[in-house]
Regions:
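N-terminal cap/leader regions of alpha/beta-hydrolase-fold enzymes
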Residues: 1-154
C-alpha cells in the first residue's frame, strides 16, 4: 500500500509541472520499477499507459497481508514485456496477472520472450544459473515494442 501511495504522490506531483501534457502521461519500469508502473495503473490514476520490463506482478497488499481490491476497472493501457523463464515472475505469475487485468477490464498485452530470463535488458546481467541474463533480441525487440505502444496511445 505504501508503495502505491508513493507512486500516486509522485504522479500527482509530476502532473503539476507546466511542461507536462496531462493527457499524455505514461510510466515505464524495469524489475521493481515495473511493479511500480503496474501498481500505478492498478490505483485508478488517470495515466494513459504503463510498460513493465521484466517486472514483478504481485498486487499491492495491506499490512495485514490481505490483497487490496484497488480499482474495479483499469483504464490505462498496459504493455508487459516478459522473459518467460524469469524466476522472479514465473509463467504462473504471468497468468495470474493476465487474469487480474482481464477481471478489471484493462486494455493489456503481454509479450513473452522464450528462453529469456530476468534482467534481459541489462547488458551486464550474467547470472544465467540464477535466471538473470541479458538477451540482445529481447532487449531490442522490447524497446521497439514500447516505442510503438506509446506512439499508438499518444
Amino acid at each position: 500500500v505504501l508503495l502505491q501511495e508513493r507512486m500516486i504522490n509522485a504522479f500527482e506531483t509530476l502532473k503539476n509541472f507546466d511542461q507536462v501534457d496531462k493527457n499524455k502521461t505514461g510510466a515505464i519500469g524495469f524489475c521493481f520499477g515495473g511493479k511500480c508502473a503496474l501498481d500505478l495503473a492498478r490505483s485508478g490514476e488517470d495515466i494513459k499507459g504503463v510498460v513493465s520490463f521484466h517486472g514483478l506482478y504481485d498486487a499491492p497488499t495491506a499490512s495485514t497481508g490481505k490483497q487490496l481490491k484497488g480499482t474495479l476497472k483499469i483504464d490505462s493501457s498496459i504493455l508487459i514485456l516478459h522473459g518467460y523463464d524469469d524466476p522472479m515472475a514465473t509463467p504462473k505469475n504471468m497468468i495470474e496477472l493476465a487474469d487480474e487485468l482481464n477481471s478489471k477490464k484493462a486494455k493489456w498485452q503481454i509479450h513473452a520472450y522464450g528462453n529469456v530470463g530476468h534482467a534481459f535488458t541489462n547488458p551486464e546481467a550474467n547470472q544465467r544459473e540464477n535466471g538473470l541474463f541479458y538477451d540482445r533480441y529481447a532487449d531490442e525487440h522490447s524497446w521497439n515494442e514500447m516505442k510503438n505502444f506509446f506512439s499508438k496511445i499518444f
